[in-house]
């Protein structure tokens, strides 16, 4: 009898183990073909075959194999954002079992990504750069290291894919408790695959890893309403331990996500399951302790990211660590700031808390207006809006409010927790809450998105799912079908927002690091436009032809009136300019210039920040056609001479019109042309075609200042006359005023002049010009300064 009882208990224990193995196995995607039991609400579901399981298994198989087929080197061509540190750390752990940055680690980067330097790889030291470590939180790299060893960079993407599909399965198993299996599978797959989160599968960064940690925490930790009576005690404790332990993985990367754990903790506290609560806490502590302990073993610190000296560096060539004590000493001493090849580590911007452990305790530096503005962007922003980039998370919230609001207090705690996490980002890093310069959607908050699925109980009415597919089709398709970036002019991670639907969403003007935009300052205004359709050229602003171009004018004062000089290049062009309530329509026959005056009325937006108030005006320029214009793109100095880079390249731009902002227009009618010439010195003889300088001194005898900036400014210029006084060169080189010249003041300028190409006797006629308006001589009766100059043949002695 005793042996029989023992056998029965062993059999029961084995059965419980099989059930637990089934749940855990679904997370790691060991797909079980045993038929599951039916959902509570669906007694008619077949016990022998479940099409939902087969569908998810097929989708899982496809996505699991896809990352392994990517050709290397080539797809993608380079490491972006923080990928360099995470991937090379995984390689170092896989092959060297350490996190030290050594020449062999640099070699590995160029084996798969040989087409350019690896930028902004974050490293750290605690001994003056004698020993260098990878400085990103290491746990993602550690767990992905076996896959990186087997498959290289593709292995890290493969590592991301099982976690993504595990989230789909967890969502399916959770939703099946309350819904038919087919509907549960459809919603879960749509939630995770039709989301910007799926784009991060193709990033060698921990976003998917963190999402998986949050999803697994809630899957294991929330009460299971499909179970009758009290669950098996040991099973309950094991699930609680796993819930706390797996959340620690995300918390190590981003501590604020510890708030997600409040939901299961509340449920255990409410039900007075003190032991379960304690085991949950124990799981979190043990997991975090193990993670920190391994970090100490590898780097000497609980975190390689905090409490250390941290730096961003560029990998320029194989076999060479780009930062050493000698390089740092040279930089600190002003000795060049780079190694012998010019590779200069770029400093990582520090917050007010630097790299210390107190970085979570920043001071609040945001006004209520900015907070409200950021909340709006957070929900529907063009680059970050949650409702746009994760449409099924929005549907999950709707289903929760419709069907789940009276059922479980822990779900309200969960909603409050993720809300607090979102508000933390918006409040304490109000200028960078989207995730820095390398992001799609909201990279920081994407970790919390799986929590929204666990708010759902009944998916009713199911027809609401169609809204999610409509939003995904309009806004996510361009992003999801180009996971490695789109081949577009002016390539950027944000290229997807150039589609028509995104025009109706607000641009996040509060964020500093949104790539893909030109930002120029003209006449006290900051003007922002997309790089592919906006090309500032000095005082002129070229806007793209055959399309609609959106520009933002941002200044500290309202703009009651805006005057523009509009230059058309294409014959038969039809141009419409809208700014606020003002609208101008221009029809051009050919190349010509016109002046338009716009009264925009109320600003598009008033941004009330802590230190200033900014007035924002939105302009939309639509050109029917355009003309190809040429310009020269200049590049910053090449810090990686191993890779050849041109200092400048010739570029093409399909230009609709060129705009020159002339201010409010009041100064355009100012009589500022009275001038008195001072002692001006010019060489009596110059060589043909030679550029030379004239020391020009003049007094402003008018009642108005001579402006030195903006399109309508005063420049020094000249004409060339022949010996008989006939003008042979009208528009000479421009020399800007060094500063605004008030009435009655004198200015002395080294004026640039270019000699005529042919030898002979000439007269240099100095004549200031009020740009876009008139030459001074046209308004003051011809008060120019004429200087005889002998132009000698090229190569002659011009002394």
Can you annotate each of these PLM segments?
Residues 23, 29, 39, 52-60, ...:
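Signature aromatic-anchored transmembrane alpha helix within multi-pass, membrane-resident enzymes
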Residues 37, 168, 265-266, 387-411, ...:
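Hydrophobic, aromatic-rich transmembrane alpha-helices
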Residues 90, 187-188, 192, 220, ...:
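Membrane-interface alpha helices of multi-pass inner-membrane proteins
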Residues 95-140, 144-148, 309-370:
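Interfacial juxtamembrane loops and adjacent helix segments
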Residues 155-180, 216-220:
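Transmembrane-helix motifs of polytopic, lipid-linked glycan transferases
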Residues 169-196, 211-212, 231-235:
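Transmembrane-helix signature of polytopic, membrane-embedded enzymes
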Residues 170-173, 209-230, 239-247, 264, ...:
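Specific aromatic-rich, kink-prone transmembrane helix
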Residues 223-230, 259-285, 289-293, 399-408:
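Perimembrane helix-loop-helix junctions
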């Amino acid at each position: 009898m005793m042996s029989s009882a023992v056998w029965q208990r062993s059999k029961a224990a084995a059965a419980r183990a099989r059930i637990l193995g089934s749940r855990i196995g679904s997370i790691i995607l060991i797909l079980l073909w045993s038929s599951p039991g039916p959902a509570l609400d669906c007694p008619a579901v077949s016990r022998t075959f479940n099409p939902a399981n087969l569908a998810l298994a097929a989708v899982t198989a496809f996505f699991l194999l896809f990352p392994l087929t990517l050709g290397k080197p080539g797809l993608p061509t380079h490491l972006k954002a923080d990928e360099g540190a995470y991937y090379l750390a995984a390689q170092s752990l896989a092959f060297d079992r350490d996190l030290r940055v050594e020449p062999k680690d640099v070699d590995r980067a160029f084996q798969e990504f040989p087409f350019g330097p690896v930028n902004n790889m974050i490293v750290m030291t605690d001994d003056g750069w004698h020993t260098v470590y990878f400085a990103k939180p290491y746990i993602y790299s550690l767990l992905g290291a076996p896959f990186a060893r087997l498959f290289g960079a593709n292995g890290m993407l493969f590592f991301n894919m099982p976690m993504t599909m595990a989230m789909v399965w967890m969502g399916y198993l959770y939703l099946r408790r309350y819904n038919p299996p087919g509907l549960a599978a459809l919603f879960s797959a749509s939630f995770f695959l039709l989301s910007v989160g799926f784009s991060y599968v193709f990033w060698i960064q921990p976003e998917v890893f963190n999402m998986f940690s949050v999803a697994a925490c809630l899957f294991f930790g929330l009460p299971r309403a499909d179970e009758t009576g009290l669950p098996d005690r040991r099973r309950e404790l094991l699930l609680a331990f796993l819930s706390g332990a797996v959340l620690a993985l995300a918390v190590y990367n981003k501590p604020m996500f510890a708030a997600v754990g409040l939901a299961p903790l509340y449920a255990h506290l409410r039900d007075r399951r003190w032991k379960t609560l304690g085991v949950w806490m124990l799981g979190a502590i043990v997991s975090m302790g193990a993670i920190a302990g391994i970090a100490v073993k590898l780097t000497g610190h609980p975190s390689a990211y905090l409490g250390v000296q941290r730096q961003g560096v560029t990998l320029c060539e194989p076999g060479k660590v780009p930062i050493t004590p000698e390089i740092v000493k040279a930089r600190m001493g002003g000795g060049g700031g780079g190694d012998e090849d010019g590779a200069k580590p770029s400093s990582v911007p520090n917050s007010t808390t630097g790299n210390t452990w107190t970085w979570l305790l920043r001071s609040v530096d945001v006004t209520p207006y900015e907070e409200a503005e950021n909340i709006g962007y957070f929900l529907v922003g063009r680059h970050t809006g949650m409702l746009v980039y994760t449409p099924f998370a929005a549907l999950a919230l709707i289903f929760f409010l419709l069907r789940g609001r009276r059922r479980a207090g822990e779900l309200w705690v969960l909603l409050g927790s993720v809300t607090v996490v979102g508000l933390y980002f918006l409040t304490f890093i109000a200028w960078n809450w989207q995730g820095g310069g390398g992001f799609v959607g909201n990279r920081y908050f994407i970790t919390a998105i799986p929590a929204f699925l666990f708010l759902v109980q009944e998916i009713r009415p199911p027809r609401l799912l169609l809204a999610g597919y409509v939003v995904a089709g309009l806004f996510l398709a361009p992003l999801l079908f180009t996971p490695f970036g789109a081949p577009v002019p002016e390539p950027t991670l944000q290229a997807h927002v150039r589609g028509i639907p995104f025009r109706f969403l607000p641009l996040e003007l509060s964020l500093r690091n949104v790539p893909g935009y030109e930002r120029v300052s003209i006449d006290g205004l900051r003007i922002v436009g997309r790089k592919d359709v906006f090309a500032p050229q000095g005082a002129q602003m070229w806007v793209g032809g055959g399309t609609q171009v959106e520009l933002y004018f941002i200044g500290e004062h309202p703009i009651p009136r805006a005057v523009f000089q509009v230059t058309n290049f294409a014959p038969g062009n039809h141009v419409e300019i809208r700014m606020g309530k003002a609208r101008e329509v221009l029809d051009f026959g050919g190349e010509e210039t016109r002046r338009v005056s716009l009264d925009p009325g109320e600003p598009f937006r008033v941004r009330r920040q802590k230190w200033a108030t900014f007035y924002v005006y939105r302009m939309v320029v639509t050109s029917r056609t355009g003309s190809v214009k040429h310009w020269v793109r200049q590049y910053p100095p090449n810090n990686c001479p191993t890779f050849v880079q041109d200092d400048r390249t010739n570029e093409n731009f399909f230009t609709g019109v060129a705009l020159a902002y002339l201010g409010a227009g009041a100064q355009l009618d100012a009589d500022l042309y009275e001038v008195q010439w001072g002692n001006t010195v010019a060489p009596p003889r110059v060589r043909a075609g030679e550029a030379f300088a004239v020391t020009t001194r003049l007094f402003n005898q008018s009642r108005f200042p001579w402006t030195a900036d903006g399109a309508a400014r005063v420049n020094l210029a000249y004409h060339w006359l022949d010996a008989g006084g006939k003008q042979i060169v009208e528009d000479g080189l421009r020399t800007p005023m060094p500063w605004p010249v008030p009435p009655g003041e004198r200015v002395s300028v080294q004026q640039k002049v270019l000699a005529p190409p042919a030898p002979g006797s000439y007269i240099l006629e100095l004549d200031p010009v009020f740009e876009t308006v008139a030459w001074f001589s046209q308004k003051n009766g011809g008060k120019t300064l004429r200087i005889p100059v002998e132009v000698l043949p090229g190569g002659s002695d011009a002394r």
